[in-house]
Amino acid sequence: QAEMMMQFMQGGLDMATFWPLFWDSEFGFRSFFDKKTGKLQPTSEIMKIFGTFQGNELIEYTASPAPEKIPSLAVRDAATGKMALCLLNKNDFTVEAAVGGRLAARKKRVEVEQFRMSADRMSLEHAPVCKAKAGSVSLAPFSLTFIYL
Protein backbone atom coordinates (compact mmCIF):
# COMPACT_ATOMS: atom_id res chain seq x y z
CA GLN A 1 0.00 0.00 0.00
CA ALA A 2 2.86 2.41 0.73
CA GLU A 3 4.30 2.14 -2.77
CA MET A 4 0.86 2.61 -4.30
CA MET A 5 0.24 5.73 -2.18
CA MET A 6 3.56 7.19 -3.34
CA GLN A 7 2.65 6.47 -6.97
CA PHE A 8 -0.73 8.16 -6.50
CA MET A 9 0.94 11.27 -5.08
CA GLN A 10 3.59 11.37 -7.82
CA GLY A 11 0.79 11.19 -10.38
CA GLY A 12 -1.00 14.17 -8.83
CA LEU A 13 -3.77 12.23 -7.09
CA ASP A 14 -4.41 13.81 -3.70
CA MET A 15 -7.05 11.38 -2.47
CA ALA A 16 -7.32 7.59 -2.49
CA THR A 17 -9.89 5.00 -1.49
CA PHE A 18 -9.12 2.50 1.25
CA TRP A 19 -9.75 -1.21 1.14
CA PRO A 20 -8.48 -3.50 3.91
CA LEU A 21 -6.18 -6.32 2.83
CA PHE A 22 -6.37 -8.54 5.91
CA TRP A 23 -9.32 -10.55 7.13
CA ASP A 24 -9.86 -13.17 9.80
CA SER A 25 -11.19 -15.97 7.56
CA GLU A 26 -11.72 -16.85 3.92
CA PHE A 27 -15.24 -15.43 3.97
CA GLY A 28 -14.73 -12.98 6.82
CA PHE A 29 -15.15 -9.22 6.66
CA ARG A 30 -12.02 -7.16 5.99
CA SER A 31 -11.66 -4.82 8.91
CA PHE A 32 -9.82 -1.55 9.49
CA PHE A 33 -8.82 -2.74 12.98
CA ASP A 34 -7.46 -5.97 14.42
CA LYS A 35 -10.43 -7.33 16.40
CA LYS A 36 -8.18 -8.92 19.04
CA THR A 37 -5.89 -5.97 19.77
CA GLY A 38 -7.97 -2.99 18.62
CA LYS A 39 -4.97 -1.68 16.66
CA LEU A 40 -5.19 -0.41 13.11
CA GLN A 41 -4.37 -2.96 10.41
CA PRO A 42 -1.09 -2.17 8.54
CA THR A 43 -3.02 -0.90 5.51
CA SER A 44 -4.97 1.51 7.72
CA GLU A 45 -1.73 2.73 9.29
CA ILE A 46 -0.20 3.42 5.86
CA MET A 47 -3.23 5.44 4.76
CA LYS A 48 -3.11 7.43 8.00
CA ILE A 49 0.63 8.11 7.64
CA PHE A 50 0.42 9.24 4.01
CA GLY A 51 -2.68 11.32 4.69
CA THR A 52 -0.43 13.93 6.30
CA PHE A 53 1.59 14.30 3.07
CA GLN A 54 -1.19 14.39 0.49
CA GLY A 55 -1.69 17.76 -1.16
CA ASN A 56 1.92 18.86 -0.55
CA GLU A 57 4.27 20.05 -3.28
CA LEU A 58 6.40 17.32 -4.89
CA ILE A 59 10.09 18.25 -4.95
CA GLU A 60 13.03 16.99 -6.98
CA TYR A 61 15.81 15.05 -5.32
CA THR A 62 18.37 12.35 -6.01
CA ALA A 63 18.53 9.12 -4.05
CA SER A 64 20.65 6.01 -4.15
CA PRO A 65 19.74 3.16 -4.60
CA ALA A 66 17.60 3.95 -7.62
CA PRO A 67 13.83 4.42 -7.15
CA GLU A 68 13.22 1.10 -8.90
CA LYS A 69 14.96 -0.66 -5.99
CA ILE A 70 13.85 1.65 -3.16
CA PRO A 71 10.61 3.50 -4.04
CA SER A 72 10.75 7.05 -2.73
CA LEU A 73 8.92 10.36 -2.67
CA ALA A 74 9.86 13.88 -1.53
CA VAL A 75 7.31 16.54 -0.55
CA ARG A 76 7.33 20.08 0.81
CA ASP A 77 4.60 21.62 2.93
CA ALA A 78 3.98 25.06 1.38
CA ALA A 79 2.66 26.49 4.66
CA THR A 80 5.60 25.49 6.87
CA GLY A 81 8.38 24.89 4.33
CA LYS A 82 9.11 21.56 6.01
CA MET A 83 10.33 18.86 3.62
CA ALA A 84 9.98 15.10 3.97
CA LEU A 85 11.56 12.25 2.04
CA CYS A 86 9.84 8.88 2.18
CA LEU A 87 11.85 5.71 1.42
CA LEU A 88 10.30 2.23 1.20
CA ASN A 89 12.56 -0.79 1.71
CA LYS A 90 10.69 -3.87 0.46
CA ASN A 91 13.79 -6.05 0.84
CA ASP A 92 14.51 -8.56 3.60
CA PHE A 93 17.87 -6.89 4.30
CA THR A 94 19.07 -3.47 5.47
CA VAL A 95 19.79 -0.94 2.72
CA GLU A 96 22.01 2.14 3.03
CA ALA A 97 20.35 5.05 1.23
CA ALA A 98 22.11 8.26 0.18
CA VAL A 99 20.18 11.46 -0.44
CA GLY A 100 21.29 14.34 -2.65
CA GLY A 101 20.05 17.45 -4.46
CA ARG A 102 18.01 20.12 -2.70
CA LEU A 103 17.33 17.81 0.22
CA ALA A 104 20.96 17.06 1.09
CA ALA A 105 22.06 20.69 0.77
CA ARG A 106 19.48 21.93 3.24
CA LYS A 107 20.75 20.66 6.63
CA LYS A 108 23.62 18.81 8.26
CA ARG A 109 21.33 16.90 10.65
CA VAL A 110 17.88 15.54 9.95
CA GLU A 111 15.04 13.83 11.82
CA VAL A 112 14.38 10.20 10.89
CA GLU A 113 11.18 8.29 11.62
CA GLN A 114 10.78 4.62 10.75
CA PHE A 115 7.89 2.17 10.57
CA ARG A 116 8.92 -1.50 10.40
CA MET A 117 6.71 -4.42 9.48
CA SER A 118 6.49 -6.92 12.34
CA ALA A 119 7.88 -10.44 11.90
CA ASP A 120 4.35 -11.85 11.51
CA ARG A 121 3.53 -9.11 8.91
CA MET A 122 0.40 -8.16 10.85
CA SER A 123 1.44 -4.80 12.31
CA LEU A 124 3.73 -1.82 11.87
CA GLU A 125 6.27 -1.17 14.61
CA HIS A 126 7.02 2.52 15.04
CA ALA A 127 10.56 3.66 15.82
CA PRO A 128 10.44 7.13 17.38
CA VAL A 129 11.85 10.15 15.58
CA CYS A 130 15.59 10.48 16.07
CA LYS A 131 18.32 12.83 14.85
CA ALA A 132 20.73 11.58 12.19
CA LYS A 133 23.54 12.89 10.03
CA ALA A 134 22.20 14.19 6.70
CA GLY A 135 23.16 12.45 3.47
CA SER A 136 22.77 8.78 4.38
CA VAL A 137 20.39 6.63 6.40
CA SER A 138 20.00 2.90 7.10
CA LEU A 139 16.68 1.46 5.96
CA ALA A 140 15.58 -1.54 8.02
CA PRO A 141 14.18 -4.58 6.17
CA PHE A 142 10.50 -4.18 5.22
CA SER A 143 10.36 -0.60 6.46
CA LEU A 144 8.93 2.78 5.58
CA THR A 145 11.34 5.57 6.54
CA PHE A 146 10.69 9.31 6.64
CA ILE A 147 13.51 11.87 6.67
CA TYR A 148 12.33 15.31 7.80
CA LEU A 149 14.19 18.52 6.97
Name these PLM-found stretches.
Residues 17-21, 62-63, 87-89, 99-101, ...:
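Active-site proximal loops enriched in glycine and acidic residues that flank catalytic Cys/His/Asp
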Residues 124-126:
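Short linear proline/tyrosine/threonine-rich motifs used for host-factor recruitment
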Residues 102-122:
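Solvent-exposed beta-hairpin/edge-strand motifs
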Residues 6-10, 75-77, 102-104, 136-139:
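A general structural signal for short secondary-structure junctions and capping/turn motifs
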Residues 24, 93, 120:
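Surface-exposed, flexible loop/turn segments at secondary-structure boundaries
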